[in-house]
Amino acid sequence: MVWTRFKSLANFLEKFQTMILTIVRKVLLPILPFFVGSNFALITYKGQLGQMQTFIWVVLLIVLCQFVWMFIMYVIASIYSRRNGWLVAKYYPKAYFTALGTMSSAATLPFALECIAESPIVKKDTADFALPLFSNLHLCGSVIAEMSLVSAVYYMMFGCLPNMYSMLLFAVLACVIAIGSPGVPGGLNMSCITILGSIILVDQAPEAMVEFFGIMTAIYTIQDGFGTACNVTTDGALALMTDKYLAKKNLA
């Protein structure tokens, strides 16, 4: 009886997930380019286009931070596993550029599995287990981009940075929300709208919140491919650490 109910619940959740992803792909994603374009049109109309040049440097800084983080992750993985992390990372350019183009961890997963299968130091069974798991749980590149853009947009609009307590609380909650955010373009940013309004913009007028969300979504969507690529590439480092851990526990 219990097993039958469990299977019924699992089937319901799978159908619900399929329904939500269908809505995202069929409704939200097609209108996203129009939303981004309308926000840039509004920025141009208000004469704020000159300020947008600042975000070019912000995006470049975000990409640099993501590459630094990828390097750190593979160094940590090499130290923990006592194997050369380069023997995983060097096979990942294909997955990186696929993620850069698709802006979707889910769409890039088959290519990531192909890439890590070429590595001689990660077992196939471990990779098949670890990569699908981490593609949903581990969104470090997206969180780096989200935190950086929140600070940059806030400074552009209000002339100061959010207080440290609010940013730390937002960072913790963003990491938690990242676990459940959909693996679609702009998924983390859209998932963080609620905590943006309740933590970072709690003292701002509703009109300012709407404008903030619009600018955030426009800029985030443009650079989202780099965050997704960072997510996918660092999953290889986590897979290497997972392989070592399972070997130590005699589980693989």
Sequence positions of predicted segments:
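Transmembrane alpha-helical segments and their short flanking loops
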Residues: 148-252
